[in-house]
């Protein structure tokens, strides 16, 4: 017997740690606990058979059977707290580690039953950041789908007509909404789901998380930041390209060159043992020494004011970080490198690729061309 357990009570559809531990996808909350290395699910009658067939855990218990046990002991109705109490008493558990997102009311009720609860800091499963070969394969597949979706709309932008300072297609202004919808439809055809996909032009692109709206401008950069999830594997890809239809200004051309160079700095530095903070600082320094400064100007942040990258997997943003905080990279992690420059008089430039940290450096998993000007 072990006197301690891990516990997550959530819906795996919304909790990547829970899905990672169980490989069971469900929209409603269920109980996962790990005792002495043994993974256990407690499932409703609706899901118990599917969980036994699909999950990767060691044991699947019936919620209704545990409730029946509680009723024999005079406990009725028996909810999650009472069911866990029966299970933990049977197995000698006294201490429980939970994630920071654990429901407060349930935590209070378990403490009232005499259990000692503590929060296990993220990463809840430290091994999750180092990807197994099958996880890397899943990310590669999501990347290929993403690149195809990006290519489909880059061709549309390249074929658009320049009318004044706007792009037109088939007699109508070409809008962020039309491009986003086209990408989402392409992704759906490949069993991927795109949400909040960024198609931002003009000064909208100076806000890195603005998804973009309205007509797209000629001669200004258009940021395409695409981060779909595979509905088959549940793994994400995350790729950004910046394109322009028309004639870029000299400032935009310089910004694009510097961002590409910043990416190359990241590619060369990323390897096992590298500090994500040092990678980020090297790119910041490259921009600064070339005269592209970061700070607030007339009430708006301009320059390079976000992190260089983040881990990628079952979540779009997960450990490790490549930014302003020390984080040592390990072989097998998948990270993004996505420097950017943003100025209201020129627009936004961001280029993002996904990298696998290898034994002696990194492999760039995303291969889509990095070209600013598209079309004739």
Predicted features along the sequence, with ranges:
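Active-site neighborhoods and metal-handling regions in enzymes and metal-associated proteins
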Residues: 1-376
């Amino acid at each position: 017997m072990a006197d301690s357990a891990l516990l997550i009570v959530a819906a795996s559809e919304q909790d990547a740690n829970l899905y990672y531990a169980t490989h069971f996808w469900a929209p409603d909350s269920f109980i996962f606990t790990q005792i002495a290395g043994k993974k256990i699910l407690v499932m409703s009658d609706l899901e118990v058979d599917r969980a036994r067939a699909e999950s990767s855990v060691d044991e699947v218990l019936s919620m209704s059977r545990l409730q029946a046990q509680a009723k024999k002991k005079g406990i009725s109705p028996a909810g999650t707290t009472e069911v866990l109490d029966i299970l933990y008493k049977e197995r000698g558990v006294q201490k429980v580690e939970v994630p920071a997102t654990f429901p407060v009311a349930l935590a209070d009720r378990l403490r009232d039953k005499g259990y000692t609860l503590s929060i296990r800091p993220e990463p809840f499963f430290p091994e999750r950041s180092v990807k197994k070969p099958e996880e890397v394969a899943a990310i590669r597949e999501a990347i290929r789908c993403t690149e195809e979706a990006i290519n489909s709309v880059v061709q549309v932008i390249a074929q658009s007509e320049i009318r004044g300072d706007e792009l037109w297609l088939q007699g109508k202004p070409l809008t962020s909404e039309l491009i986003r919808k086209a990408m989402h439809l392409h992704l759906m055809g490949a069993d991927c789901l795109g949400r909040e996909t960024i198609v931002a032009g003009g000064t909208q692109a100076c806000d890195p998380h603005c998804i973009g709206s309205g007509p797209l401008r000629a001669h200004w950069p258009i940021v395409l930041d695409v981060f779909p999830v595979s509905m088959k594997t549940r793994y994400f890809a995350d790729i950004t390209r910046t394109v322009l239809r028309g004639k870029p200004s000299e400032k935009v051309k310089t910004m694009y060159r510097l961002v590409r160079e910043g990416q190359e700095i990241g590619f060369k530095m990323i390897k096992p043992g590298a500090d994500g903070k040092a990678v980020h600082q090297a790119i910041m320094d490259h921009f600064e020494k070339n005269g592209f400064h970061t700070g607030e100007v007339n009430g708006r942040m301009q320059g390079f004011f976000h992190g260089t990258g983040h881990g990628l997997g079952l979540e779009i943003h997960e450990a490790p970080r490549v930014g302003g905080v020390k984080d040592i990279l390990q072989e097998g992690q998948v990270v993004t490198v996505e420097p950017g420059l943003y100025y209201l008089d020129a627009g936004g430039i961001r280029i993002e690729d996904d990298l696998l940290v290898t034994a002696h450096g990194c492999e760039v998993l995303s291969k889509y061309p990095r070209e600013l000007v598209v079309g004739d």
